[in-house]
Amino acid sequence: MVKIGVCGPVGSGKTALIEALTRHMSKDYDMAVITNDIYTKEDAEFMCKNSVMPRERIIGVETGGCPHTAIREDASMNLEAVEEMHGRFPNLELLLIESGGDNLSATFNPELADFTIFVIDVAEGDKIPRKGGPGITRSDLLVINKIDLAPYVGADLKVMERDSKKMRGEKPFIFTNIRAKEGLDDVIAWIKRNALLED
């Protein structure tokens, strides 16, 4: 089972990305999802209503505190959810774990996630990639979402591209508009090539 952590600031499009990935990949792969919210299970409920996956393949973890603690310093609740999900589905191939909304320093405990996708959105401004932080610099894949909003918020995608290359070196990043499925195929191709080790 490959575990992919998806993290990023509130509203960046983490849940939309996971919903789109499950919709496009669950027919070919044995998949499940774990979501994290501080005080609710809202993201899990959204997934249950909007995903093609049955409810038993989605677990919502209510962290009750700082979102990055639940995925990094004390990942015990999430590790228990991973164990529970693996018990339910022993042949699970791909488990997507969504963090609660957090800042640019969010990273996953290596026991919890084999790969990390960090999601930011253009509406936060074109300066976000150059601000760095572990989410930007260390994630396996950086997704820059909501590119359709760039002209409305004064964000320059060329600046974001330049700064992403500078901050990430050889590590990949993908521009997306998840709602319109733009860039989604590139994210799926990255997952298949890097996480699932397909050609």
From Swiss-Prot:
Which cellular components does GO assign to this protein? Answer: cytoplasm
Location of the protein in the cell:
Cytoplasm
Please, one GO biological process term? urea catabolic process
The protein's matches in InterPro entries, at most eight in alphabetical order, are given as: CobW/HypB/UreG_nucleotide-bd (IPR003495), P-loop_NTPase (IPR027417), UreG (IPR004400)
GO MF term list: GTP binding; GTPase activity; identical protein binding; nickel cation binding
Instruction: Please give the knockout or disruption phenotype noted for this protein.
Output: Cells do not express urease.
What Pfam families does this protein's entry cite?
cobW
HAMAP family xrefs: UreG
According to its UniProt entry, the function of this protein is described as: Facilitates the functional incorporation of the urease nickel metallocenter. This process requires GTP hydrolysis, probably effectuated by UreG.
Its protein name is Urease accessory protein UreG
